[in-house]
């Protein structure tokens, strides 16, 4: 027992020394890391994993990018390499299938028509109908008699068409309604263009001899109003009527003078008034006014303005048209207007009260 104890006691310090050997050593122990670093990952795998987080890859398995352990990352990288090989193989198979696939050629959908639509228009290719059956009044599609509507670009049953129309009833009704609406708006616009809402007569031209508007008549003597707006805004209807009558009288006198100029001093046909006496042939007409000396101030006739243009004054004294008709007397000149008629005399010639009104 003692020997054993001695032996034990002798072995005890040795064992104690052996148990306390590590702290007694003077050399410092090597520091142990708190955790193992993750396994190094290849740069290409790391780029693929980062790309999987920032982009959409539909139809592919996403990468496992987590911080749970390095083993999963390593397994994911290994599996990614295998998956990359499988993906490239799948892509190669898809390319082979696409190369070997025959393109579908569009054909006419009418039963019994096997015409390919390769060299036809894009319209017929898109709607799968040939040009002949697109205009046919009756075809068989899906076992039913139908007709191709040109506005809907599709086939309808025959009950949706009126007689031999190429468009269905619904589209034709909408088209007619739009046309009616546009015609009504145009008519309203034409009516609103007139001061009193009077519609345009005939084909847009007034009857011969009537003024072109209720506000006044177009004058042949006023060149400024011929190029610009010539409507005369007047307060009442009586003033407008007087202005229109003045314009018509002036136009009639201008026509008479032009006829005298082109008559070339020939005797007129029987029954046609000449508007001048037999002895006034040399005095009347335009030849008497083509003189180098300008007429005296206040006398009617032809005068030359500063620009060199020759102007015929129609309100001259009745030297040419005073033989057979009633004597006319000029009305006092009206004040100049704002429209540019400065310097023009009155366009009206009124008969004397003893002779009465007489308009040629």
UniProtKB/Swiss-Prot annotation:
Entry-linked InterPro entries: SBP-like, SBP_dom, SBP_sf
Subcellular location, principal: nucleus
Protein name: Squamosa promoter-binding-like protein 7
Ranges for region Disordered: 74-98, 172-196, 261-306, 318-360
Expression (tissue specificity): Expressed in young panicles.
One GO location term (cellular component): nucleus
Domain writeup: The SBP-type zinc finger is required for the binding to DNA.
Extent of motif Bipartite nuclear localization signal: 165-181
Function: Trans-acting factor that binds specifically to the consensus nucleotide sequence 5'-TNCGTACAA-3'. May be involved in panicle development.
Stretches of the chain forming a coiled coil according to its record: none
Gene Ontology MF terms in the entry: DNA binding; zinc ion binding
Compositionally biased region (Gly residues): 74-89
SUPFAM superfamilies (alphabetical): SBT domain (SSF103612)
Any one Pfam family match given in the protein's UniProt record, by short name: SBP
Organism encoding this protein: Oryza sativa subsp. japonica
Gene: SPL7
Biased composition range(s): Basic residues: 172-182
Binding positions for Zn(2+) 1 per the UniProt entry: 108, 113, 130, 133
Keywords, in A-Z order: DNA-binding, Metal-binding, Nucleus, Transcription, Transcription regulation, Zinc, Zinc-finger
Keyword hit for 4Fe-4S: no
Protein location: Nucleus
Sequence positions that bind Zn(2+) 2: 149, 152, 156, 168
Zinc finger (SBP-type): 105-182
């Amino acid at each position: 027992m003692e020997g054993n104890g001695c032996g034990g006691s002798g072995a005890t310090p040795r064992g104690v020394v052996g148990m306390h050997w590590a702290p007694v050593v003077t050399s410092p122990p090597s520091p142990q890391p708190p955790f193992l670093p993750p396994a190094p990952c290849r740069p290409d795998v790391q780029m693929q994993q980062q790309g999987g987080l920032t982009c959409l890859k539909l139809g592919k398995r996403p990468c496992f990018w987590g911080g749970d352990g390095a083993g999963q990352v390593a397994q994911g990288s290994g599996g990614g390499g295998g998956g990359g090989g499988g993906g490239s193989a799948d892509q190669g198979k898809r390319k082979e299938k696409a190369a070997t696939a025959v393109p579908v050629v569009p054909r006419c959908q009418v039963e019994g028509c096997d015409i390919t639509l390769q060299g036809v228009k894009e319209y017929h290719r898109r709607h799968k109908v040939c040009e002949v059956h697109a205009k046919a009044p009756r075809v068989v599609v899906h076992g039913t008699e139908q007709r191709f509507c040109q506005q809907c670009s599709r086939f309808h049953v025959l009950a949706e068409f009126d007689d031999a129309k190429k468009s269905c009833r619904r589209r034709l009704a909408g088209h007619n309604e739009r046309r009616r609406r546009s015609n009504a708006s145009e008519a309203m616009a034409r009516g609103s263009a007139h001061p009193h809402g009077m519609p345009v007569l005939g084909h847009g031209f007034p009857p011969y001899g009537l003024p072109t508007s209720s506000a006044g008549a177009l004058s042949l003597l006023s060149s400024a109003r011929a190029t610009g707006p010539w409507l005369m805004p007047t307060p009442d209807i009586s003033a407008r009527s007087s202005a229109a009558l003045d314009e018509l009288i002036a136009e009639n006198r201008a026509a008479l003078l032009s006829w005298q100029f082109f008559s070339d001093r020939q005797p007129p046909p029987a029954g046609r008034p000449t508007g001048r006496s037999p002895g006034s042939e040399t005095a009347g007409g335009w030849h008497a006014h083509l003189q180098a000396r300008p007429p005296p101030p206040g006398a009617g006739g032809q005068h030359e303005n500063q620009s060199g243009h020759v102007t015929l004054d129609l309100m001259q004294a009745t030297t040419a048209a005073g033989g057979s008709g009633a004597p006319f007397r000029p009305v006092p000149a009206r004040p100049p207007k704002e429209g540019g008629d400065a310097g023009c005399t009155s366009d009206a010639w009124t008969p004397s009260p003893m002779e009465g009104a007489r308009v040629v």
